[in-house]
From Swiss-Prot:
Protein name: Formate-dependent phosphoribosylglycinamide formyltransferase
UniProt: Mg(2+) binding residues: 267, 279
Binding site for N(1)-(5-phospho-beta-D-ribosyl)glycinamide: 22-23, 82, 286, 355, 362-363
Annotated function: Involved in the de novo purine biosynthesis. Catalyzes the transfer of formate to 5-phospho-ribosyl-glycinamide (GAR), producing 5-phospho-ribosyl-N-formylglycinamide (FGAR). Formate is provided by PurU via hydrolysis of 10-formyl-tetrahydrofolate.
GO biological process, one term: 'de novo' IMP biosynthetic process
Length: 392
């Protein structure tokens, strides 16, 4: 039986968030709703989740010793990674000593880089993936690209939000793509993955929850990517029953192999009735922000419910809904938002993340909308997001 203590009391149930961005902020809010004490951690001060947590700390989360010292000091019941750039080897060691890592330290380690999860999916679980090769140096990268064939895609094995990623059409682009990949990795220059291009009709995120009452699925989420990062997402994404069945089979196989309880964002390519595995995040997914308006229980609430050991039960999806990001470009430590009235109303909601700094382009919020169909929902969300005026 799950029990929850009282925040800021000796019997408190404590959750430590490793990563305090917009996704972590929503997880923190859901923890707060259940009376859970929240400790938010990130590499910079005043991150979004820190603004709604009981306490916060600024550390280099890739520093294993610093991370272990903080966990020893705070003694959280649950360590909840919300980003990939964490000293996962230390999490594995702490888990062996009895620390609860969500969903598991192994899941955090395998999904920190593309190589771990790709080898698990393709070579151990035998789920369909794109053709791929890994390379450490330019010569090996060139050979990998030639073996895969053109066009192909190169990505650092450790990167996110499209950083360091290139679409290569011909051999003359290899050097530029290699240099860009070396700049985009979370840990600096290093290993890359070269992938063959998959012919697909659309991409989906299948939010998959592993809980005490089994495996659960949200309705599939479609999304549009630009520069390697999502711009709009919508739910439900229409697909054939056979494709949906296959997507669920792949997602369940991957999630079960990673283990633990929590929500996983499983990314898949869909072409007709066929599905191809792309990536998985063992945590809420940015495209899943649409669930803040599209479901009775958001992806963030589902994640918290699952890792606390509570049953998920049925998930109600309300109908066509969409999200669109607010992505301004400016330099400021004092951001201001205007024209907000156009972004709220019946079936129209706004989330501003409260990020304290922007330098260049940065996702600062999201507009959420419902509609009579997906096209209308997306149009309403995009219009609302574009209407928000950001200055600083």
């Amino acid at each position: 039986m799950t029990t929850v203590g009282t925040a800021l009391r000796p019997n408190a149930t404590r959750v430590m968030l490793l990563g305090s961005g917009e996704l972590g902020k929503e997880v923190a809010l859901e923890c707060q709703r259940l009376g859970v004490e929240v400790i938010a951690v990130d590499r910079y001060a005043d991150a979004p989740a820190m603004q709604v947590a009981h306490r916060s700390h600024v550390i280099d989360m890739l520093d294993g010793a610093a991370l272990a010292a903080l966990i020893a000091d705070e003694k959280p019941d649950f360590v909840v990674p919300e980003i990939e750039a964490i000293a996962t080897d230390m999490l594995v060691e702490l888990e062996k000593q009895g620390q609860h890592v969500v969903p598991t330290a192994r899941a955090a380690k395998l999904t920190m880089d593309r190589e771990g999860i790709r080898r698990l999916a393709a070579e151990e679980l035998w789920v369909p993936t794109s053709d791929y090769r890994f390379a450490d140096g330019y010569d090996a990268f060139q050979a990998a690209a030639e073996a895969i064939g053109f066009p192909c895609i190169v990505k650092p094995v450790m990167s996110s939000s499209g950083k360091g990623q290139s679409f290569i059409r011909e051999a003359s682009q290899l050097m530029a793509a290699w240099e860009y990949a070396q700049q985009g990795g979370r840990a600096g220059a290093g290993r890359v993955i070269v992938e063959g291009v998959v012919k697909f009709d659309f991409e989906i995120t299948l939010l998959t929850i592993s809980a005490v009452d089994g495996i659960h699925f949200c309705a599939p989420i479609g999304h549009r990517q630009e520069d390697g990062d999502y711009r709009e997402s919508w739910q439900p994404q229409h697909m054939s029953e056979l494709a949906l069945q296959r997507a669920r089979q792949v997602a369940e196989k991957v999630v079960t192999a990673l283990g633990g309880h929590g929500l996983f964002g499983v990314e898949l390519f869909v072409c007709g009735d066929e599905v191809v595995f792309s990536e998985v995040s063992p945590r809420p997914h940015d495209t899943g922000m649409v669930t803040l308006i599209s479901q009775d229980v958001s992806e963030f609430a589902l994640h918290v419910r699952a890792f606390l050991g509570l049953p998920v039960g049925a998930i109600r999806q309300y109908g066509p809904a969409a999200s669109a990001v607010i992505l301004p470009e400016l330099d400021s430590d004092n951001v201001q938002y205007a024209n907000l009235s156009a972004a709220v109303g019946a079936g129209l909601q706004l989330r501003l993340f409260g990020k304290p700094h922007i330098q260049g382009k940065r996702r600062l919020g999201v507009a959420l909308a419902t509609g009579l169909d997906i096209d209308e929902a997306v149009q309403r969300a995009v219009s609302a997001a574009n209407g928000v005026k950001v200055s600083g």
